[in-house]
Amino acid sequence: VENMKYSNLNDGIDEYLKKYEDTFYVSNLDFAIDLIRTGGKKFNLRNTTNYNAENQCFEEKVSGVETLDLVTSFLAELDGDYLQCFTKSFNEGRFDFYNDLENNDKKIRGICSYEGYTVNFNGTISDSRTIIHEFFHSLNIKNYKLAPIFSEMISIFMENKFLDFLNTKGYSRNDIAKSRLARYNDFSGAWNRLIIQSNFLNLKNKIGYLDEESYDFISMHEKELNFPHLSKEDFIEVLEFLDDRIKNSEKIEQAFNPEYSFRYYIGTIYSSYLLLQEDSLDKVLLLNEYLRKPVEETDIESAFRIIGIKDETDFRFI
């Protein structure tokens, strides 16, 4: 295979499939792809926002002390031990602030352990929002079975609730809006990459080696393969692009990582859905507590039921 065309692409995807075969995403590829496609049509993800560099500038300055006060004040309003957990984590050094220069230093970035989080300090509300997001990850990330599915949803939901909290405290509504837009712009920008990589991952998993010669077979069996119609020119263009990206990357995940992108997709879609429900905060906190249980005491069906998703019809609410 090494001497065959597109060997980087094929070998790389084979490696990826083997590494992630037990994940929810890879184990349910056709189902995941249907969700991604439906969401793209429903929300017109190619044109969700018009967010550019000018929109990223926040107006209101927030000091480091004020940032921590905001985080602790928000957590204190939640039922449970969240404030105590954050205080303990912070005092143990699991959250650190760095500026842009320090964050780009490999030595400093390497200091961050698996359970540590660095916050690129900007002196704006984005700092406290990031802390809230990463803090909730830290609470449930050890549940290797369910965290890949639910952790992003919980963190994105809670960061939005935190932005609601900032609004009640009189912080800049423009900055709050920009902060929300940043999340959804990132989401819409990643969607196109996610659907392309998912389609080709699924195709590789079903038919084996991908190259120009496989196009005719694929085009004849698009429905059975759950693969969208592409011209041969577009098909080859994607093959060449992915092959080159994988060839020039040290790790497959640097060039091709749809499982990771899928977490953000599910997290953004379902957190947005839950934000429309009045009792959603209670549901999400209950789900977070469920993920904090020993892994062997949790299962995916129970987790979905906690947030009101009882069957496939509910799951496909979009």
Region spans (language model):
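Post-HExxH zinc-binding segment in Zn-dependent metallohydrolases
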Residues: 144-187, 303
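Inter-helical turn/loop segments and adjacent helix faces that build the functional surface
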Residues: 20-23, 78-81, 142-146, 164-175, ...
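Short pre-active-site segment immediately N-terminal to the catalytic Zn-binding motif
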Residues: 113-131, 143-146
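Contiguous, non-catalytic segments that form substrate-binding/exosite surfaces or channel walls
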Residues: 1-116, 310
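Short glycine/serine- and small hydrophobic-enriched flexible loop segments
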Residues: 157-168, 202, 269-276
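Long, amphipathic alpha-helical stalk/connector segments used for oligomerization, subunit docking
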Residues: 167-255
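Catalytic glutamate of the conserved HExxH
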Residues: 130, 134-138, 142, 153
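C-terminal, non-catalytic "cap/extension" segments appended to globular domains
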Residues: 5-40, 45-52, 215-318
